[in-house]
C-alpha cells in the first residue's frame, strides 16, 4: 500500500497492491459534441410536452465531405494516368516504339480538371434533386387538381439509393439519412408536414367524450 491507497497486502489478490487505471473502460458518449441526442436533464427534462425534434446535420461538413470525395476520385485518376504513362514508356523502350501516346503534365492536368468539373456538376444536380423531392407534398396537391406529372417529376418516385454503412463518427451523414428516411415514411403514410407529434392521438381523445355526449342525448 502506497500513501494509504491500494490493498493492505497484495497476497492472494493477483496484483501488485497498487491502484491502476482501467484502460479497458470506455465511457459511453451520451453528451457533448458529436453526441447523437442531447441528455435529458435540467431544462430538457421539462420539454417532454414538446414534439420530437430531429437533429439537423451540418451542411458545411456534409459539403466538405462530398468535395473531399471528389478530390479523391480526381487523385485516383491522376495516378492512373501517370501509371499509364510509365507503362507506355517501358513498352516503348522494349519495342522501340510505344503503342500509345505519353501524356504531358499539362494534358493530365486538363483531364483532371475536366473530371473535377463533371463530378462537381453531378454533385450540384444531386443537391437540386433532393431539394425538388422536398416539394413532393405540394405536387400531390396539384395532382388532385388535375395537374399532369412531367418526366422530371417521375424521377422523384425512383427508389432510394442503396443504403451505405455509416461509421460511428459520421453523425451528420447519419442524421441526413435519417431525415430522408423520415420524409419517405411520411410520404408513404400521407402525413402532412405541419402535423405535430401526438396530434392524431389527442384528436381521438377529444372525439371519445363527444361521442358519449351524443349517445347520452
Swiss-Prot record:
It is found in: Cytoplasm; Nucleus. Residues 30-108, 122-217 are annotated as: Disordered. One of its GO terms (cellular component) is cytoplasm. Residues 62-122 form the CWF21 domain. It holds the Pfam family cwf21. Keywords: Coiled coil, Cytoplasm, mRNA processing, mRNA splicing, Nucleus, Spliceosome. Its main location: cytoplasm. Residues 55-104, 122-165, 173-195, 202-217 have a biased composition (Basic and acidic residues). GO terms for biological process: mRNA processing; RNA splicing. InterPro entries: CWC21 (IPR051372), mRNA_splic_Cwf21_dom (IPR013170). Residues 65-135 form a coiled coil. It comes from the Eukaryota. Belongs to the CWC21 family. Involved in pre-mRNA splicing. May function at or prior to the first catalytic step of splicing at the catalytic center of the spliceosome. May do so by stabilizing the catalytic center or the position of the RNA substrate. Associates with the NTC complex (or PRP19-associated complex). The NTC complex associates with the spliceosome after the release of the U1 and U4 snRNAs and forms the CWC spliceosome subcomplex reminiscent of a late-stage spliceosome. PANTHER family: SERINE/ARGININE REPETITIVE MATRIX 2 (PTHR36562), SERINE_ARGININE REPETITIVE MATRIX 2 (PTHR36562:SF5). This is Pre-mRNA-splicing factor cwc21. The gene is cwc21.
